[in-house]
Amino acid sequence: IFSFRKETDGDFRDSRYQHNIKIIRVEDNGDVDFVLYGYMNRGVREGYCGVCVYHYSNDQNVVEEKVFIPSTESYEFLKEDLGTLSYVSTENALYLLFANKLYKINISDGTSEVLEEGIKKDDFAVSDTGAHAAWIIQEGESAGNIKEIDFETLETRSLAPSSGQSLVLNGFMNEDLVYGIVVDGD
């Protein structure tokens, strides 16, 4: 569906492989939504590094850019980040974690927003289906709390430790959040 390579008259840009594609949804009619991430070899984004969301229309045989989010992260870091979370909700919203930020991207209209910043990948977990995520808040009044989100409803809940305790995020079992309570000094 997509390539930076030219069939004829290729040049040095054809041999730069610091990008990849992640398919995020395939519909029954053959339409495909995918994310291109890393270094952009050609086109209007040539020379930039980032994440680009595309929609391929099978009926029209056309690839349309929906949104581009530039990044200073290298291809290797983007690849690792996008392996952590890339979930499409029933409302056609794509949720991505990269560059320590949780993004919501509306695939239909191409808008994007940052839902949360300062998320450490090591303190972030995603459920089996990708519909839920949780992370430990790093800064501010809520530092040390666990925040959980449901990507279908955007409902969140916050778990706070009692005095003299801290929380450890263990991950998910299916769609259920698993965390531990540690008594300070243990």
For the regions a language model picked out, list residue spans one by one.
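Short beta-strand elements that form the blades of beta-propeller/WD-repeat-like
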Residues: 1, 22-55, 83-98, 130-140, ...
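Surface-exposed loop/turn elements that mediate protein-protein interactions on large endomembrane-trafficking
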Residues: 1-17, 43-78, 97-117, 141-163, ...
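Repeated scaffold domains used in trafficking and secretory/extracellular systems
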Residues: 11-26, 71-87, 117-129, 163-176
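Long amphipathic alpha-helical scaffold regions
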Residues: 119-182
